[in-house]
Amino acid sequence: MSEISAQLVKELREITGAGMMDCKKALRESNGDKVMAIETLRKKGLASADRKANKVATEGVIVSYIHTGYKIGVLVEVNCETDFVARRNEFKDFAKDIAMQIAASPSVEYITFNDIPAEIIEKEKKIESMREDLKNKPEDIKQKIIEGRIRKNLELLVLYDQAYMRDQSINIETLVKLKISYFNENIKIRRFTKYILGN
């Protein structure tokens, strides 16, 4: 096994928020594979993240980001449980990353898939159900195919489904869970507004 570089440990720590020794151990266990190390850390820490997801998050920050060229601006509210966490630079940096992610994702309109209005999903369902390749399929298989296609078509609109700009191997939903584990309290991306010059 090759030596684990300090740079790799630093990258993993920035992504996951886990401690330096935990990152180093996870990288050793995964023979330096960053994706496998993230999975290892998730397995160790995300059980607590899932429990914490039900706690009320009323503290937090509102962060602004103006993209290069001054043509796109984003305001995002990211909540946590305590003002102690809200004041931490790591939390503010996470919120700034989310604002940058939104600015860099031109089609993102919703935080989670469940935030998409029912009428948009129904419209997609009608379009997909009229496709020729589904006409001779059994109804139960047809419904599963339609659901899969709707999910695929609409995932570009959902922030949680976007690959994280700093590490394409994880999406924003996974990043939020990793941050819940790191800060040891619930974290929520509550809302955002994107301004595009001329729109």
From Swiss-Prot:
Native source species: Galdieria sulphuraria
Assigned protein family: Belongs to the EF-Ts family.
Compartments it resides in: Plastid, Chloroplast
TM segment ranges: none
MF GO annotations: translation elongation factor activity
Keyword annotations from UniProtKB, A to Z: Chloroplast, Elongation factor, Plastid, Protein biosynthesis
SUPFAM superfamilies referenced in this protein's UniProt entry, alphabetically: Elongation factor Ts (EF-Ts), dimerisation domain, UBA-like
The name this protein goes by in its record: Elongation factor Ts, chloroplastic
Coiled-coil features, chain-numbered ranges: none
Domain of life per record: Eukaryota
Main localization (coarse): plastid
Role of this protein: Associates with the EF-Tu.GDP complex and induces the exchange of GDP to GTP. It remains bound to the aminoacyl-tRNA.EF-Tu.GTP complex up to the GTP hydrolysis stage on the ribosome.
GO annotations of cellular component type: chloroplast; mitochondrion
PROSITE patterns: EF_TS_1 (PS01126), EF_TS_2 (PS01127)
